[in-house]
Design a protein with these regions (language model features):
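A short, N-terminal "cap"/entry segment at the start of jelly-roll beta-barrel domains
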Residues: 1-40, 118
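Glycine- and acidic-residue-biased ligand/ion/polar-headgroup-sensing regions
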Residues: 50, 59-74, 81
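Short glycine/proline-enriched turns and hinge-like loops at secondary-structure junctions
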Residues: 40, 58-60, 77-79, 98-99
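Ligand-binding loop in jelly-roll beta-barrel domains
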Residues: 78, 89-116
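Short, well-ordered beta-strand segments in beta-rich or mixed alpha/beta enzyme
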Residues: 43-48, 67-70, 95, 105-108
């Protein structure tokens, strides 16, 4: 991302990138949209296949998920399309998809993304 340049991305034209998660024994899918070189902030589309829940973990970054399709299942409840869920930095959490349907979210971090399983 160049400073001072607008970015427009046709997300429909991007291919889903498969990311195998050894802890879960399943793949998750993403489309990377933007990474800010100054702050490390990241924006991506993430798809959790039906039944996949990312087990208890933390991040050294805050992050939000805007639900586009399906239902986001979290340790605090379920959230459908149009919902925005914010997770503070360091919070222990679980999130993923319902058993019967994939969930697609717009995933936004405030700095570089890392995951630490508990």
């Amino acid at each position: 991302m160049e400073k001072g340049q607008m970015i427009a991305i046709d997300t429909q034209a991007l291919q889903w990138e498969e990311r195998f998660n050894e802890k879960l024994g399943r793949a998750l899918y993403r489309k990377n949209l933007v990474t800010d070189p100054d702050t490390g902030m990241e924006i991506r589309l993430v798809r959790y296949p039906a039944g996949v829940i990312n087990v208890r973990h933390t991040h050294p970054c805050a992050h939000g998920m805007y639900v586009i399709e399906g239902t986001l299942v979290t340790h605090a409840g379920q959230f459908g399309p149009g919902s925005f869920v914010w997770f503070p930095e360091g919070m222990a959490m679980e999130h993923g998809a319902t058993a019967d349907r994939d969930v697609v979210v717009l995933f936004i971090t405030n700095k570089p993304f890392e995951i630490h399983y508990l």
